[in-house]
C-alpha cells in the first residue's frame, strides 16, 4: 500500500504540468465516454440495485438511470469550462522592504474521498480533481461496487490516454481503506461522505485531517411576517422534492401567531405525499383530524435526519427562539427563514452558525451545481478550510510567492 500511495504522490506532479486547455480536453473526453457508454453503467447499476435489499434514502442515492447519467455528463462539461484555479493570484502587495508578495492557489495534494452509495461521485470527483490538479484515491461503498467499477474503468481509460492513470486509484475493500488511514505522511486530507457513524469511525482511526460532511439536519423557520403562499412553495420543495438528499428539510419551525393558518395550508399538500408529522406538543392540536400520521415528538425527534417523507414540527414565539432551537439541534448544514421582516432576516443570517443560511428560498439549493461550481466533492459542515458546497477552489490551498532584488532582513 505504501508503495502504491508513494507512486501516486510522485506522479501527481503530472497534474501540475497540465495547461487549462489540457484539463478542459480531458474532462470533456470523460463526459463523452460516459455518455457513449451509459448502457454499460446502467447494467452494472442493475446488479447493485438487485443486491441491495434495503429501502429508503440510500436506495435512491444508489440508483442511476439514463436521465441521471446525462445530467452527470452535463455537470462534467460545466466543470471543464470553469476557470482553472491553479496558479491563480488572489492578491499581491509590496512590503516595507520592497518585496513583492503574492498569494497563489495550489492543489491540496493527495486527497482520499470515501463515499457511500452515489456512484456518480466516481466521475464527478475525478473531474474536480483533474481540474484542481489533485491526485486522489477513491473508496466507494460496497453497495455500489459494480457501478463504481464500471464508471472508474471508463475514467481510467481516459486517464491512460493522457498518461495520468498513476495519479488516481480506486479501492473497493474495507480493509484497504483501514490501511490508507495510517498513511498521514502521504495523504493530505480525507473527505468522507456518508453516515455520521462512518465519519466518526474514520475520525477515530486516523491522524489525517478530515473535511467532514455531517448529516443534513436542515431547518426552516416561517416567520410571522412571511408570505404564506411563498412559504408553502418553499416548504414543499425543501421537504418533498427529493427526501433522500442531505439538503432536504427535516425540521419546520412556525411562528405561533400564524400556526393555524399556515398548517391549514400545509395539510392538504402533505396528504399528497403522505408526510408523517413528528410534532412538538405545542403543535399537535393543529394536526387533529388531518388524516396524516402524527407522532408526538420525543427527546430524539429534533436531532433526527429523517431522509424520508417525515418532518419534525414545532411552534416558536419569535425569531430568537427559532435561532436558539436551530443552534442547539443543527448539523451545521443548511437553514432557511421565510420572512418579510428585514431585521429578523439579518438576525437569522448573522446568528446561526450553519454553512448555508437562506432567506426566502429552499434549502435544496445547497449543491455545488446549483451554486455554479459545476459539481461538488461534498458539502462541508466543518468550520476549518471549507464550508458548504465544496467546488474546485475548496480543494485548493495556497502558497506565497515572494520576489526580491537582493533584500536582506536587518
Swiss-Prot record:
HAMAP family: ProA
Subcellular location per the Swiss-Prot or TrEMBL entry: Cytoplasm
Disulfide bonds: none
Record InterPro entries: Ald_DH/histidinol_DH, Ald_DH_C, Ald_DH_N, Aldehyde_DH_dom, G-glutamylP_reductase_CS, Glu-5-SA_DH, GPR_dom
Function: Catalyzes the NADPH-dependent reduction of L-glutamate 5-phosphate into L-glutamate 5-semialdehyde and phosphate. The product spontaneously undergoes cyclization to form 1-pyrroline-5-carboxylate.
Tagged with keyword Chloroplast: no
Pfam families: Aldedh
UniProt keyword list: Amino-acid biosynthesis, Cytoplasm, NADP, Oxidoreductase, Proline biosynthesis
Catalytic activity: L-glutamate 5-semialdehyde + phosphate + NADP(+) = L-glutamyl 5-phosphate + NADPH + H(+)
Protein name in UniProt: Gamma-glutamyl phosphate reductase
Database matches in SUPFAM superfamilies: ALDH-like
GO annotation terms (biological process): L-proline biosynthetic process
Pathway the protein takes part in: Amino-acid biosynthesis; L-proline biosynthesis; L-glutamate 5-semialdehyde from L-glutamate: step 2/2
Gene Ontology MF annotations: glutamate-5-semialdehyde dehydrogenase activity; NADP binding
E.C. designation(s): 1.2.1.41
GO CC, alphabetical: cytoplasm
Coiled-coil features, chain-numbered ranges: none
Superkingdom, taxonomy of origin: Bacteria
Family that this chain belongs to: Belongs to the gamma-glutamyl phosphate reductase family.
Amino acid at each position: 500500500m505504501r508503495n502504491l500511495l508513494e507512486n501516486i504522490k510522485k506522479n501527481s506532479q503530472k497534474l501540475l504540468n497540465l495547461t487549462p486547455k489540457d484539463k478542459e480536453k480531458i474532462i470533456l473526453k470523460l463526459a463523452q465516454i460516459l455518455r457513449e457508454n451509459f448502457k454499460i453503467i446502467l447494467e452494472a447499476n442493475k446488479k447493485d440495485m438487485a443486491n441491495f435489499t434495503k429501502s429508503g434514502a440510500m436506495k435512491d442515492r444508489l440508483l442511476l438511470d439514463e436521465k441521471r447519467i446525462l445530467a452527470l455528463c452535463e455537470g462534467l462539461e460545466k466543470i471543464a469550462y470553469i476557470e482553472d484555479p491553479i496558479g491563480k493570484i488572489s492578491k499581491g502587495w509590496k512590503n516595507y522592504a520592497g518585496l513583492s508578495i503574492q498569494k497563489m492557489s495550489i492543489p491540496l495534494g493527495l486527497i482520499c474521498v470515501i463515499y457511500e452509495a452515489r456512484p456518480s461521485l466516481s466521475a464527478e470527483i475525478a473531474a474536480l480533481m483533474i481540474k484542481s490538479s489533485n491526485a486522489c484515491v477513491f473508496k466507494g461503498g460496497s453497495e455500489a461496487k459494480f457501478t463504481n467499477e464500471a464508471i472508474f474503468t471508463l475514467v481510467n481509460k481516459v486517464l491512460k490516454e493522457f498518461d495520468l492513470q498513476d495519479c488516481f486509484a480506486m479501492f473497493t475493500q474495507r480493509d484497504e481503506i483501514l490501511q490508507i488511514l495510517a498513511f498521514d505522511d502521504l495523504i493530505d486530507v480525507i473527505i468522507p461522505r456518508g453516515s455520521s457513524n462512518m465519519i466518526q469511525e474514520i475520525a477515530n482511526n486516523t491522524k489525517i485531517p478530515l473535511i467532514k460532511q455531517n448529516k443534513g439536519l436542515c431547518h426552516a423557520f416561517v416567520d410571522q411576517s412571511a408570505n404564506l403562499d411563498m412559504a408553502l412553495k418553499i416548504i414543499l420543495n425543501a421537504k418533498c422534492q427529493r427526501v433522500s438528499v442531505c439538503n432536504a428539510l427535516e425540521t419546520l419551525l412556525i411562528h405561533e401567531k400564524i400556526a393555524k393558518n399556515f398548517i391549514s395550508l400545509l395539510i392538504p399538500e402533505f396528504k399528497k405525499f403522505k408526510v408523517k408529522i413528528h410534532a412538538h406538543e405545542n403543535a399537535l392540536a393543529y394536526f387533529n383530524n388531518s388524516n396524516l400520521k402524527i407522532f408526538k415528538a420525543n427527546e430524539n425527534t429534533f436531532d433526527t435526519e429523517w431522509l424520508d417523507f417525515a418532518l419534525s414540527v414545532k411552534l416558536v414565539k419569535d425569531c430568537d427562539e427559532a435561532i436558539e432551537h436551530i443552534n442547539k439541534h443543527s448539523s451545521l448544514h443548511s437553514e432557511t427563514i421565510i420572512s418579510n421582516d428585514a431585521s429578523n432576516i439579518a438576525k437569522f443570517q448573522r446568528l446561526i452558525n450553519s454553512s448555508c443560511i437562506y432567506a426566502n428560498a429552499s434549502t435544496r439549493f445547497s449543491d455545488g451545481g446549483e451554486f455554479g461550481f459545476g459539481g461538488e466533492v461534498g458539502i462541508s459542515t466543518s468550520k476549518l478550510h471549507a464550508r458548504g458546497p465544496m467546488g474546485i477552489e475548496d480543494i485548493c490551498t495556497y502558497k506565497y510567492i515572494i520576489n526580491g532584488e537582493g533584500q536582506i532582513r536587518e
